[in-house]
Amino acid sequence: SGKHCIIGFFFVFMQAIYDTGIGYIEDESIVRIDKIQNRRNPQSVIDIANKLRDDKIIQEPSEDLNAPNMQLGSIIQGNVKFVYADNIDNLKNLKAKDIFTDWNFNDGEHTKELWLTHKFNSTKAGFSQLFELYNSDLIFEMIQKIKKKISNGDISPDNKNFEEISEEAAITKGKGILILDIIKGNSKYNNFYETFKSSPWQVIENNYIDSDSLLSYKFNGLKGFYEAGTKRDKILRKLDDVFELFELYKYKKYNAFLRKTKFKISNYADKKRLSDEMNILSNNIDKTIEEVIISANQALRIENDVFFDEFINTQGNYLWERIKKIPFKEYMKSIEYQREYLPFATQHSVKGSEYDNVLVILDNGKWNQYDFRTLFGSGSVNEGVINRSKKLFYVCCTRAMKNLVVFMPTDDPGIIESAIKMFGNENIVNGNDIS
């Protein structure tokens, strides 16, 4: 047609924290337009970020006097600290000290504590049992591995119950330890195993737990509210419905509340009875998930839908037997975590976000895809691990709008010396010496 078309590619090389996608385009025909001015971070964080960058860009404060990182015509200096201690357990004590005087760890909107994985955060946020069930349940792991052995033709499932096929399959974990032995040696797991061991294998094999289901409660930007994602299972959707009723009543949205229940209000006595019922329900969060569902159904005149009943009696049977005994408050904590009401988040999840105060914990646990020691010239020599760790650390640091504290459990003199070069000697804190 003779018309010229300009195609723009927007990306930040240092924020390519996932192995999928394209992190960098190398083509001589592309005109590179670098974003030099930084509108988010204080000077102290910009300085750290520039030391981490390996894309040949050196950022500087914005020239816009109205930029978020400007105050009275000058760049906000901000504060950065590198804190080290012998043990990760020291962190709890450190959070109560002067270094965090102006931080409010109950304010998830302005303060974030960044850990590498949801597993770390589930413990901190108060839903570790739920997270373990959806991500590392031993009985479900054994079921999946037995199915794989059957698929490979290693064993035959014909006319066998769960106990028989579990013993024949001899599934191992770690250093050759039988998963079945681990299950029998754990009273919690063994109780569930005893419940299901006589069931026919063709019934057991249909049980499924989707690890993505628990954390699939997301904000819908178009609708302006949080809702269940497509991977949300029927049990969690039921809990979402109950929790929604709690919130509708709490925030006095009575018309919407009544539309979703069969509770009828004809006089003051009905209104008083509803108030009493809701007070009882709201004080029952320490009860189990099953107890809360039963109480809510009875008090609010609601019923389980056919999809819920079908799910808990078929592929969700084992999941239901497990989850129904977990305290309802763990479910509530998982919702608060996903709504970002709590100060905990994964380092991957905050890309694009910004907070006044950011605490980054450099502990990669047992995830061998990362090694934060490489930031300071130690640890893994794997190039992928080195690049992955650096970019993730860069993303974490550049979330801070005022204060950045990096905590690392280490006593390695080489790491501490390298940290001094990166952060400056005046910004290094020995957490072991803080009393």
Segment roles from a protein language model:
Residues 1-435:
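The feature marks helicase ATPase cores and/or their adjacent C-terminal helical subdomains
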